Amino acid sequence: MTAIRYEFIKTCKQTGARLGRVHTPHGSFDTPTFMPVGTLATVKTMSPEELKAMDSGIILSNTYHLWLRPGHEIVREAGGLHKFMNWDRAILTDSGGFQVFSLSDFRRIEEEGVHFRNHLNGDKLFLSPEKAMEIQNALGSDIMMAFDECPPFPATFEYMKKSVERTSRWAERCLKAHERPQDQGLFGIVQGGEFEELRRQSAKDLVSMDFPGYAVGGLSVGEPKDIMNRVLEFTTPLLPDNKPRYLMGVGSPDSLIDGAIRGIDMFDCVLPTRIARNGTCMTSEGRLVVKNAKFARDFGPLDPNCDCYTCKNYSRAYIRHLMKCDETFGIRLTSYHNLHFLLNLMEQVRQAIREDRLGDFREEFFEQYGFNKPNAKNF
């Protein structure tokens, strides 16, 4: 019996998007879904109870950061990540690969793994497929990610080809090193940049290894959205229908809808909490920067169409005041609202799939949100 099981429910006749449910050792969640990111075993400024109140069934935490602080052995001694952070629903941990490639100024890639420097103090560190599995096994997440190479965008075909081949070899080593397959599901990560031939090769390699789920990596790294959508169109059909599909690092509302239309089940991104910290809010009418002077005497909610805790209790003027005074409560209120907005958006997406009208929903949402304008402001 595998730790992770995907239950297919239905396909949207209008778009081909899929409705499903992922079953884990810590409960089930409906898909397509958005996963709030709790990098250091906390979703910034949010309590587990608040995340449950907005119906989050799974959150993401970060292997690299927890390895450095507090250390995976301390988390193991605490009884695993769920007990350590008092979260009894599903947790996904990434492999640390993205952080190694994005945070460290110095890195050297070898067949064995990656040498790099700790971004906190400059110490030399080494991360390999085996080490990534050791850390994630200690953390005890429900879904673990294979250690992959995260190439930059753009990259040449030759570079990407070598990178894909190495990622496939590393994936095999991850499977061999994974010590808890009965209670932790390990996902493989399809790479290949914007090259269809390499995506095909990567998917073929990984599907042959029979992972319980698959991620599409190497997107949302600076490429235009039309390239991301095109890559998804030729990549997701290569993945098994009976396994969950996860698009890494994507969290803008338009990309969540477009990803679901292209067969993706799971998304994660720091975007909603990151932009909340500077006062940028997602609303049903588009992007709103609550710090702006025009909201100083606006006593209405952030979003008149939202029923979250923030919108039911606090005004734009009050939240603006908190943000201008650097009060943490302001960040809590905007973070709560943005996370609720995306989780509620995914429920609307699921409902549209149930009703076979996700294409219509997309048009309505894009029109109302302002994504159809010539110079649409994104995040």
Curated annotation (Swiss-Prot):
Family indicated by similarity: Belongs to the queuine tRNA-ribosyltransferase family.
InterPro entries the record matches: ArchSynthase1/Queuine_TRR, TGT, TGT-like_sf, tRNA_ribo_trans-like
Keywords, in A-Z order: Glycosyltransferase, Metal-binding, Queuosine biosynthesis, Transferase, tRNA processing, Zinc
Residues noted as binding substrate in the record, renumbered to the chain: D94, S95, G96, G97, F98, D148, Q191, G218
Positions annotated to bind Zn(2+): C306, C308, C311, H337
Protein name, per record: Queuine tRNA-ribosyltransferase
Cofactor note: Binds 1 zinc ion per subunit.
Top-level taxon of origin: Bacteria
Biochemical pathway: tRNA modification; tRNA-queuosine biosynthesis
The enzyme's E.C. designation: 2.4.2.29
Taxonomic source organism: Bacillus cereus (strain Q1)
